[in-house]
């Protein structure tokens, strides 16, 4: 009889070393960004103070931390922006319009046809993508 070890071997090249638990965004204020992302993702705000907010999703969390001298990322410049979200949606234009109503800004330069680039209220870029592209 062979015993199977349920704990992944961290030395294996096929085993994950970690799992994504949360992504944290920097902002000058937590509440507006927490409310924005709560509406966009449909995730509840589990914690909200002036210094920090956390939204909880089905398997991940989104944190928002106060950085007093936070500067908005510049897109599409390669400067401060380090990553962006790609969100799959069924109706690009309708969801983009709703995001704008919630405080997002549609960027002027739109590099693709199956996605729309916006910035959240703190300036973080994110893309709405056609859900059909994700299978």
Question: Across the structure, where does each feature detected by a protein language model lie?
Answer:
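Generic alpha-helix initiation/capping and coil-helix boundary signal
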Residues: 20-21, 92
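Vicinal oxygen chelate
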Residues: 2-20, 35, 41-86, 97-121, ...
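Short hydrophobic/aromatic beta-strand micro-patches
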Residues: 24-26, 86-88
């Amino acid at each position: 009889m062979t015993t199977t070890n349920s704990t992944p071997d961290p030395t294996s090249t096929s085993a994950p070393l970690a799992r994504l638990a949360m992504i944290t965004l920097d902002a000058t204020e937590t509440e507006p960004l927490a409310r924005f992302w709560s509406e966009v993702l449909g995730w509840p705000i589990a914690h909200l103070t002036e210094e920090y907010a956390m939204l909880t999703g089905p398997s991940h969390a989104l944190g928002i931390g106060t950085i007093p001298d936070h500067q908005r990322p510049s897109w599409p410049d390669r400067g401060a922006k380090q990553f962006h979200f790609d969100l799959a949606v069924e109706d690009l234009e309708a969801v983009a319009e709703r995001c704008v109503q919630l405080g997002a800004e549609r960027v002027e330069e739109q590099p693709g046809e199956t996605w729309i680039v916006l910035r959240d209220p703190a300036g973080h870029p994110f893309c709405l993508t056609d859900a059909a592209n994700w299978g």
